């Protein structure tokens, strides 16, 4: 097993962990309907980039 040679200081420990956080998923607004959805996903009404791509129950 690997064993550290010297103790890592709190500053170095913090620098090591500086990228271990989560980001909120970016949201997009559908231009034709104004709905909010995840980027690169279709909106709840079946629109993607202003075009109807999936039939929904309401259609």
Curated annotation (Swiss-Prot):
Molecular-function GO terms, alphabetical: structural constituent of ribosome
InterPro entries: Ribosomal_bL32, Ribosomal_bL32_bact, Ribosomal_zn-bd
UniProt source species: Paraburkholderia phymatum (strain DSM 17167 / CIP 108236 / LMG 21445 / STM815)
Record keywords, A-Z: Ribonucleoprotein, Ribosomal protein
Record Pfam families: Ribosomal_L32p
S-S bridge residues: none
Region (Disordered) location: 1-25
Alphabetized HAMAP family for the sequence: Ribosomal_bL32
Protein name (record): Large ribosomal subunit protein bL32
PANTHER family, alphabetized: 50S RIBOSOMAL PROTEIN L32, LARGE RIBOSOMAL SUBUNIT PROTEIN BL32
Family membership: Belongs to the bacterial ribosomal protein bL32 family.
GO biological process: translation
């Amino acid at each position: 097993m690997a064993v550290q040679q010297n103790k890592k200081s709190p500053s170095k420990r913090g620098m090591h962990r500086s990228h271990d956080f989560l980001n909120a998923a970016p949201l997009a607004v559908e231009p034709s309907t104004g709905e909010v959805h995840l980027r690169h996903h279709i909106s709840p009404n079946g629109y993607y980039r202003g075009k109807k791509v999936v039939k929904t129950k309401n259609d």
